[in-house]
A protein has these predicted regions:
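Bacterial N-terminal signal peptides that target proteins for export
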Residues: 2-15
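Hydrophobic alpha-helical segments, especially transmembrane helices
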Residues: 11-12, 29, 315
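Bacterial N-terminal signal peptides
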Residues: 13-24
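Long, low-complexity, intrinsically disordered N-terminal extensions of eukaryotic proteins, enriched
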Residues: 14-16, 30, 358
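Boundary at the C-terminal end of the N-terminal hydrophobic targeting segment
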Residues: 26-32
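Glycine-rich phosphate- or other oxyanion-binding loops that anchor nucleotides, phosphorylated ligands
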Residues: 33-51, 75-358
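Mature N-terminal segment immediately following signal peptide/propeptide cleavage
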Residues: 52-58, 64
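Short Gly/aromatic-enriched secondary-structure transition segments
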Residues: 67-71
Length: 358
């Protein structure tokens, strides 16, 4: 064999290895490496209709997995997808990992490999509304990504395509309200006294997201919000689970206000972990956002693109930007947020089963 032939064979072998890695699936149950088909739905691993549950943190997923019966694990690109029965509902549960990219990747993997009738995001978040408290469980009606931005250097409304606010020649679209671009974030000026006089324009203007679906192809569409499923929201509004005030990991850490469940409003997600009270005030004043996390809006984008209804339950572990929050003693460590969130998710699954939705 000459050097050229040896090199060609190595490249061919590498190509086959990469192709195999892209298509391969390892299942602890042994059902791997083939595509199943049910009607028009293609499922690479299993085609039983299920609710798909995505969690970002292990503590959130573990509570749900502990109550899941008839569990069966599938390994997909190293991630564990667990099928089973949870509160009478056929489910598949995955730990997505933190971040917009991980949420996107693992939600799409779930939709590719299983027959998902509806999606549920289950997790914790930071509170944006100053009226919220640690341990509250929020169920927003819609989700958006305000950190998708056009960054204009001089702080003025961008207009690279001719008129102020027009960025369409770049394949982009500014987020608007009342026909006008939403205001950019004002950065506190060095040594400023606070208030509008103590800020400078950042030039960070919110953008709509571009999304392509089977229905809007080939032109696609721009969206700022992704709406949760009305039928799932209606069931969520009936829930009255008992929510704790002290964390199970440290019963001495208790919040001063009884946590509550609230359905409605807007949730937001972004690539940054928000620990900035000024930016929190900006997104509350501009968007009336209720909660912020790093996964749900990306998950919602994938759900919308695949025509799969969704809902998200987020329990507050802190007020984003946190040190000014009187309940900061309960921040993360007590386990209160994930326990309350799991209680609401489980109550929803009970109610969903009783509602006999398809």
């Amino acid at each position: 064999m000459n050097q050229f032939e040896s090199s060609a064979l190595r490249k061919l072998g590498l190509g086959l290895l990469i192709a195999g890695a892209g298509l391969g699936l390892t299942s602890q149950a042994g059902a791997a490496g083939h595509a199943a088909k049910s009607g028009t739905v293609q499922c690479l691993s299993e085609c039983k209709p299920r609710l798909g549950i995505v969690s970002a943190f292990g503590a959130e997923a573990d509570i749900l997995l502990a109550q899941t019966k008839d569990k069966r694990d599938f390994r997909i690109n190293g991630n564990r997808f667990t099928t089973g029965i949870l509160r009478g509902n056929p489910v598949v549960i995955v730990l997505s990992g933190v971040s917009m990219i991980n949420a996107t990747m693992n939600t799409q993997q779930m939709l590719n490999h299983f027959r998902i009738e509806r999606l549920i995001m289950s997790g914790i978040a930071g509170g944006v509304n100053p009226a919220s408290h640690v341990g509250d469980v929020l169920v927003p009606e819609r989700w958006s990504m305000p950190m998708e931005v056009y960054w204009n250097g001089d702080g003025s409304v961008p207009g690279p395509c001719g008129s102020a606010g027009d960025i369409t020649c770049l394949g982009l679209k500014l987020a608007t309200e009342g026909g006008k671009p939403r205001p950019d974030y004002k950065i506190p000026a060095p040594g400023g006294a606070g208030g509008a006089a103590g800020t400078v324009n950042s030039g960070l203007f919110m953008r709509d997201n571009f999304v392509m679906t089977a229905a809007n192809s080939p032109q696609g569409e721009f969206r700022f919000d992704y709406e949760a499923d009305p039928a799932m929201l209606a069931v969520a509004r009936t829930l009255t689970p008992a929510l704790g005030i002290c964390g199970p990991k440290n019963p001495t850490l208790c919040v001063s206000t009884q946590p509550a469940i609230r359905v409605g409003g807007r949730g937001i997600s972004g690539t940054a972990f928000m620990a900035n009270p000024d930016y929190r005030t900006y997104v509350f004043d501009t968007l009336k956002a209720e909660a912020v996390d790093m996964e749900t809006a990306a998950f919602a984008h994938v759900a919308y693109a695949n025509h799969v209804p969704f809902i998200a339950f987020r329990s507050l572990s802190d007020l984003a930007g946190g040190n000014d929050f009187k309940d900061v003693g309960a921040f993360f460590g007590s386990g209160l947020a994930e326990t309350n969130e799991a209680s609401v998710t489980l109550a929803f699954l009970d109610a969903w089963k009783r509602s006999k939705h398809p």
